[in-house]
Amino acid sequence: MRDRSVDLQRGILVILMLYAHLLQFFGDLQRFPSIHFWVMGISLLAFPAFVFCFGRTAALAYLKKPFRQALPRMGRTFGRCLAAFYVSGAAFRVLREHRPLEAETLRGILLLSDIPGWSEFLIAFALLMLSAIVLFPLLRQITCRRWLWLPLSIPCLLGCFLPYDRITVPQLALLMGSRSYVTFPVLQYFPFFLAGVAYTGASFRERLGMGGVAVIFSAAGLVWYVRHGLP
């Protein structure tokens, strides 16, 4: 039976993102300076929430099945996300930046050495699915031992303190982040995916516990940001 709560959550997130983009493109910042904070707040909330939903979807659609049975569908999802990135990235370079549609323009996108704007989230979802394929046995364990998501998330969160200035390879930036490229790094966002996997099928008490842990981590991150700024 399909879990409609995931669809509802994703629908709400899509509406929020559309609202944020409308404010970003058509809002009058001079008259309404608070628009910046609304756009930033929604943007900071939306992608982690989408990754959380992606984890829930993976748990429902793939992780309940044996690996050989789940692999073809996971592979198709990875392929669709990757193809969407290629199409979106090429369209951005050609239609928005007016670059010629030639091999030189496409080569960097195909090799992931060129990450065009407005396409970063697509390659992030492709790499998240690839990570789910590689880590399939571990993710299956989380569906049974849901507390595992927390110790597995801590090393990922420590990735927030990596020396981003030294990460200059675009393919590595997709995995770990960088100040040279706009990316949604898989390492730092993977805890949201793990939480989505653990949340699926959890009891009410387990979900309350996960919510409490999320509040604690969020509060700690906010305190760090106020005192030290971004890493």
Question: What spans do the regions from the language model cover?
Answer:
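Alpha-helical transmembrane segments and their immediate juxtamembrane cytosolic regions
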Residues: 1-231
